[in-house]
From Swiss-Prot:
Annotated binding of [4Fe-4S] cluster, by residue: 42-43, 108, 138
Underlying gene: nuoB1
Record Pfam families: Oxidored_q6
Keyword entries, A-Z: 4Fe-4S, Cell membrane, Iron, Iron-sulfur, Membrane, Metal-binding, NAD, Quinone, Translocase, Transport, Ubiquinone
Membrane topology: Peripheral membrane protein
Family: Belongs to the complex I 20 kDa subunit family.
Catalytic activities: a quinone + NADH + 5 H(+)(in) = a quinol + NAD(+) + 4 H(+)(out)
Protein name in UniProt: NADH-quinone oxidoreductase subunit B 1
UniProt subcellular location: Cell membrane
Gene3D superfamilies the record matches: 3.40.50.12280
GO biological processes: aerobic respiration; electron transport coupled proton transport
InterPro entries assigned to the protein according to its UniProt record, in alphabetical order: NADH_UbQ_OxRdtase-like_20kDa, NADH_UQ_OxRdtase_20Kd_su
């Protein structure tokens, strides 16, 4: 191995570059990662700052933010993913050509962040699509996004052409687009992100290898009931509903019911 290295160094002195086809191919892909122009919330402001002159994303060949997913290699999920937006994220991901990568930027995209107990926020985009790199923070600084990009480049350098999922004549995998069911987002009739109480297991991603996840996302054990998700609630108009009882509101906020002593009020 040392002899090969000496030969390579000697050849470089004479303007000859020796490498393997695999390393050359990976070098080309890692040096021209085109992100999708796609921002969801406040993390997108930091993503925009990363592309400006101070941080100079062009050093990594990733300054070409594309308006079309068919011309993009990388999806940066920057911000809170609401359940109304989640199907569109999956559609955009399915339209990206292989090889395609995903960076989950910020606490909201990774686990729901401070809104994870809300009825309308997806608790992690990896419930729907695979994620290659996670960035913690609320919001992460541009330096964190640059570090994530360098981490992704290292992953690309380590790839072998005969082992990646997109090499050869294999068909690109289409990830199912969730639909709105009676109680929330569903895939094939199965609730993918229930409101409250149930632990979540991502079917696609682990933080290290992009394989099946074995751990569970922590979540409170108490089941919460939200009026708009309750079976007894019927919507009369966009701003009016029937069936919302005081008990439901108490369950929603997890406050014990307060009994009022009207006799005591009369004595006063």
């Amino acid at each position: 191995m040392s002899d090969d290295r000496e030969i390579q160094l000697e050849a470089e002195k004479h303007g000859v570059f020796l490498t393997t086809m695999q390393r050359f191919y990976n070098w080309g892909r890692r040096s021209s990662i085109w992100p999708l122009s796609f921002g969801l919330a406040c993390c997108a402001i930091e993503m925009m700052a990363t592309g400006l002159a101070r941080f100079d994303l062009a050093r990594f060949g990733a300054e070409m933010f594309r308006a079309s997913p068919r011309q993009a290699d990388l999806m940066i999920v920057a911000g809170t993913v609401t359940k109304k937006m989640a199907p569109q994220v999956v559609r955009l991901y399915n339209q990206m050509p292989e090889p395609r990568y995903v960076i989950s930027m910020g606490a909201c995209a990774t686990s729901g962040g401070p809104f994870r107990d809300g009825y309308n926020v997806l608790r992690g985009i990896d419930l729907l699509i695979p994620v290659d790199v996670y960035i913690p923070g609320c919001p992460p600084r541009p330096e964190a996004l640059l570090h994530a990009l360098m981490t992704l480049q290292k992953q690309i350098d380590a790839q072998r052409l005969n082992q990646v999922r997109w090499y050869g004549k294999r068909e690109a995998k289409e990830y199912p687009v969730p639909t709105f069911g009676k109680h929330g987002l569903e895939i094939d009739g199965k609730l993918i992100d229930p409101v409250g109480g149930l632990p979540l297991v991502s079917p696609y991603t682990s933080p290290t290898h992009g394989e099946m996840r074995s751990g569970m996302i922590e979540h409170p054990e108490l089941v919460r009931h939200f009026p708009i998700m309750d079976e007894t609630v019927e919507r009369e108009s966009p701003y009016k509903a029937t069936g919302i009882a005081i008990e439901i509101a108490h369950n929603d906020l997890k406050r014990p019911a307060v009994e009022v002593d009207h006799a005591e009020d009369e004595r006063r």
